Each structure stands twice: as structure tokens, then as C-alpha cells.
């Protein structure tokens, strides 16, 4: 799953990326924006070649919190 997600995020679309958005609770109207933002910040989300699911999740949360439209989907810490 991580390989598929990284490939989809790198290109900005795909089934794994859509599934990730759904798991995070991103509503359909915001999924295109989610794909664009995660694509733009790919190197920050997958910041090392051996990134774990926990790394990717934490990095995604950090990116979501920085985006006005997507912040509502970030986990409240």
C-alpha cells in the first residue's frame, strides 16, 4: 500500500491516494484539492526512502494543518 500511495501522490492522483483521502475523512468536494496539496508536498510527506506508515501519516497531518481548506481534516492534537 505504501508503494502505491507514494506513486499516486507523486503523480497527483490514483486509487491509493483517493483511498487515503477517504480514510482521513476528506469529503468528496475536497479530494481534488487534497491530491494537489499532497502532490505539491510529496517530498515533505515521504521525506525518506524508508518512510513508515506512521511517518507518512504524521507528515500528512502537518501538511493538512498548514492548508486553510484541509486543516479541518487534520487530527486535533
What residues fall within each predicted segment?
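Mature extracellular/secreted ectodomains of secretory-pathway proteins
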Residues: 1-77
Amino acid at each position: 500500500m505504501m508503494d502505491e500511495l507514494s506513486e499516486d501522490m507523486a503523480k497527483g492522483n490514483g486509487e491509493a491516494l483517493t483511498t487515503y483521502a477517504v480514510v482521513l475523512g476528506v469529503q468528496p468536494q475536497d479530494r481534488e484539492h487534497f491530491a494537489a496539496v499532497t502532490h505539491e508536498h510529496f517530498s515533505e510527506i515521504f521525506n525518506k526512502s524508508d518512510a513508515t506508515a506512521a511517518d507518512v501519516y504524521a507528515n500528512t497531518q502537518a501538511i493538512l494543518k498548514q492548508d486553510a481548506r484541509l486543516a479541518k481534516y487534520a487530527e486535533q492534537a
